Amino acid sequence: FLKDLKLYESDEKIPLLKDLLVEISGKIPLVIEIKKHKNIGILENKLVDLLENYKGKYLICSFEKNILFWFKKNKPNLKRGLIFESNPKKFEKYNKTLFLYKYYKSRADFISLDYKLLDSSIYDFCVKNSLDLITWTIRNKENFEKVKEKVDAVIFESLFKL
């Protein structure tokens, strides 16, 4: 099913992960995000099997603490990251509480933080606790300039001239 879908406004098809792994052949590190789903363990086991012989570097990340905890329990040497974004305006006051809950439940190795939270107490917590930080999603040079000294890595949505 997925292999027949086309990328938005193009003739390019969405590659399967197994094909992508062969294509890049370890040339670049991968950040693999696992979206929320039911039956935690089934998809994760399939992913572990798929990555077993992959020679390149990769990280697993998710918004979901239970997915990350599954990897902590079943693949403890695999680096796992908690993705966190700000809550809607009326719930912003709960950001740090929710973050701390997810962080301590997931036992994440690094944090992938929405760039809008880089001036928050969540960012301060990460720095104080020497957590590796990735930020997302940077779409222009101005935002890149603001964040580049604060984080260990940046996720871009589109390319722009640095």
Task: Outline where the language-model segments fall.
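Metal-dependent phosphodiesterase/phospholipase catalytic core, i.e.
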Residues: 1-88, 106-109, 113-116
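C-terminal active-site rim and adjoining tail of enzyme catalytic domains
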Residues: 12, 83-85, 90-162
